Amino acid sequence: MKEMLLDKLKNCKKLVIMGIGNELKGDDAVGIYVVKKLMRYFGEEKEFINIKNLYLINAGTVPDFFTDILKEIKPTHILIIDCALMDKDVGEVKIIKEDEIINYSFSTHTLPLSIIVKYLKKFINAEIIILGIQPKIIDFCPISEEVKLSGDKLVNTLIEIIEELKLAK
């Protein structure tokens, strides 16, 4: 996964990592879980933080709310992390191509991810990377241990990449 992400993030000058999901719906929270852990590592946990050329956004169920902020930031790359029903093993992380978005069911946000990505492509000249994480359960419960473990591994990989690309220091 690290090599694939590094390849997608080559020439990255300004990175936005956006976590999407609903913390009340089990594994649907994984995007938020990852971003919150990154926030704690790089600074503080809020809805939005900026460290040098790294922007971390906890978008919750309203990623469309942050489109104006993204237009102001003008990132070169946007990494969206979301729970996705992909018929994969629980916790599996997959880079989802833009033309594959319609094949998967994403978490409980207000607008479909396909519409958000089309909007971002139209108004922001950025490479958009979508990471889907296969859930175990999407119900009123805590995030499952399997998906949490997968999220922790992704956090460690992202920290390595961010430090390697010198985006936050």
From Swiss-Prot:
Keyword terms, alphabetized: Aspartyl protease, Hydrolase, Protease
Gene Ontology molecular functions: aspartic-type endopeptidase activity; endopeptidase activity; enzyme activator activity
CDD domains, alphabetized: H2MP_MemB-H2evol
The EC number(s) this enzyme carries: 3.4.23.-
A Pfam short name: HycI
Covalent S-S links between cysteines: none
GO biological process, alphabetically ordered: protein processing
Entry keyword Transcription: no
InterPro entries the UniProt entry points to: Pept_A31_hyd_mat_HycI, Pept_HybD-like_dom_sf, Peptidase_A31
Classification via SUPFAM superfamilies: HybD-like (SSF53163)
Family: Belongs to the peptidase A31 family.
Name of the protein described by the UniProt record: Putative hydrogenase maturation protease MJ0631
Organism of provenance: Methanocaldococcus jannaschii (strain ATCC 43067 / DSM 2661 / JAL-1 / JCM 10045 / NBRC 100440) (Methanococcus jannaschii)
